[in-house]
Amino acid sequence: MEFNNSVSTIYWSLLERKFSIYVLTFLNRLKCILSNPFSISFSNNKYPSFFNANKTFLKRDSCNLFPNQSNIMFFLVVLSKRLCPNYFNNTGEKKNRGDNINDSSGNRFIDESYVSARKSMSKESNKIKQMNRKLAWIEATLNDLDIWRHSYSVFSSSTKMENNLEQQFSVLESKDTPITMMAYESISLVPRSITRTLSRFKTELMGDSNSLILNEFRLAKYQALASIQYIGCLLFILSIISMLSKTMFLKSWITNWWNTSQSHIFLNLFQEERALKELQEMEELLWLDRVMADYVKDQSQDLDIEIYEETIQLVTIYNEDSIQIILHLLTDIISIVTLIVLFIIGRKRLAVLNSWIQELFYSLSDTMKAFSILLLTDLCIGFHSPHGWEIVIGSFLEHLGFSHNKHIISCFVSTFPVILDTVFKYWIFRHLNRISPSIVATYHTMNE
């Protein structure tokens, strides 16, 4: 609203200035036409009444009501003198030598006045031309602003941008130009390169290439900023929520419930086996230390006390470990739920992020695209990938508090990469082979 008011004010000021220039030009022309406020009677003396008339006009113009009119008058009189020399020289033969001296002085005065009048009028014309250039530049700038305002929707604040996010990520259409831009282009049967080429060709034929370039630049800039901001907001919100939920109420509530409402120490059999193994190793080390130190049999009671203390310490450690496992599990559930809610709320931002990632990928060269696909597939489903999957699955199971079961891990490693390989091949066959066959050819060549 403020932008429209400013543009209207500039337009009215421009119109007012133009109108004032037209009025002044009209008055100057009118003064040139009606430039005889005195009677110029040329008698036997060549120009005496002209000098009297000039003095009379200067007296009349003492209030500076008509600036530079005297110069215009001199210019018109001298011009008429040069155009009609016979009229001014019909009594020249009857003049004496004194009249010739007066005539020469009058001629010099008229010539000087003529030169000064021409200089002043040239200065005025230069000023008018400079002012017209400035007005033309202002008018052209306002026209460009008007075209830009109709071709690209500008949001005045971030809140307004969030409220109108659906309009921003849908189709941006110009009222004056048939330019159509989209923040997200879904994959269809017709390749996007063909539709973009046809759209660009149509726009260039209609003379709207400047607006198209401006729209594409602003749209790409907005997509990049919106995607980076969205990723940063996701990471920040997830970390803040998980940290606050863990420290504020989950940890105290789980600790109180685990220590008072139930009598278990271990969550699963894996923890019990690991605790028993550590206790046996500790007893063996204590017996070995006493044998090496040649302790007497009377000190066996002290050994039982040490074993009891170590057992209590192990129980405390595993009890805290069980609390941490439950805490991590609940925190992960809260983080996943929060992430799903953020995805649902920010569906438009997620679409922009998807479009930005696709644009980054498709903007690469064919060799870089094939290299990226080959690197990703080798990491996930390559020859050495099962060892990595075993480490990842084992760490995840330990994070959730489950036992390190080799059969489950081997079953997962033998099935999941196969499914992932099938998905990759389908994606390459379904999309890349249709959009860019050169990428598929380069990928197969590098893979072989």
UniProtKB/Swiss-Prot annotation:
Membrane topology designation: Multi-pass membrane protein
Sequence intervals crossing the membrane: 224-244, 325-345, 373-393, 408-428
A GO molecular-function descriptor: antiporter activity
Keywords: Antiport, Chloroplast, Hydrogen ion transport, Ion transport, Membrane, Plastid, Plastid inner membrane, Potassium, Potassium transport, Transmembrane, Transmembrane helix, Transport
Cellular compartments annotated: Plastid, Chloroplast inner membrane
Catalysis: reaction(s): K(+)(in) + H(+)(out) = K(+)(out) + H(+)(in)
Chief site of localization: plastid
Lineage top rank: taxon: Eukaryota
InterPro entries membership: CemA
GO cellular component: chloroplast inner membrane
Any one Gene Ontology BP term: potassium ion transport
HAMAP family: CemA_PxcA
Function field: Contributes to K(+)/H(+) antiport activity by supporting proton efflux to control proton extrusion and homeostasis in chloroplasts in a light-dependent manner to modulate photosynthesis. Prevents excessive induction of non-photochemical quenching (NPQ) under continuous-light conditions. Indirectly promotes efficient inorganic carbon uptake into chloroplasts.
Family: Belongs to the CemA family.
Protein name: Potassium/proton antiporter CemA
